[in-house]
Amino acid sequence: MTGQIHFNSHVWVVTDVACRLVNALTAGHDGTRPVEPPPIGHRADAVRAVLERDDYRPALTEDQANALTALAERVREVFTASSSGDVARAAGIVNDLLEEFGAAPRLDPARGGGFTLHFHGRDTSIVLGWGAGIAAGLAMAIGSDLAGRLGVCQADPCDRVYIDTSYNLGKRFCSRRCQSRVKAAVHRAKSKGRRRRPHSHRGSSGRYPYNQASAV
């Protein structure tokens, strides 16, 4: 028992890529640090760093990187809506993405034999391919009991997104760094509150001294 929920392997790959594209390509805060998307003309490297695996090194133009950056902005809206409990809005955005990218199911040969269900776009271009795959992965997550697992970090001002793979849906932060920052802030607030608490005028016996009690 690992204490984690395991997504279907294909769903996990595409939703994980969706999450990392949002965090790499959209503006906001990473922890307390303000972040901006890579400037136009320098996005291909950032997108490639997200997509690359040992067996997959895509060629990518700046135009394609710009299109995937625009996709990341819309995927952020899905995470934000799902995290706030507005699953209907998240579903509406995903439905639009499914239609736009022409996501269609297809059985592809698997490495170990047999076949694996994948989703393809209307053509084999990298933008339509990943757009369709991400839209389908998000659709399968939102259309199941995984809907509540698309989250936005709650360590203000951080707004990086994450996928909650815990069994108890207990994840609230994008990283241990943000979790530690919030815990430290709570501890400081409690300590400050204790220091400000008025001292009791009771004596060691728990009763007021005679002169104070008689003055009441």
Where are these regions (language model features)?
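Short helix-coil boundary/hinge micro-motifs
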Residues: M1-V152, D156-D164, R197-V216
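Cysteine-rich micro-motifs
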Residues: N168-Q179
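Feature targets compositionally biased, intrinsically disordered low-complexity regions
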Residues: L169, K192, R202-S205
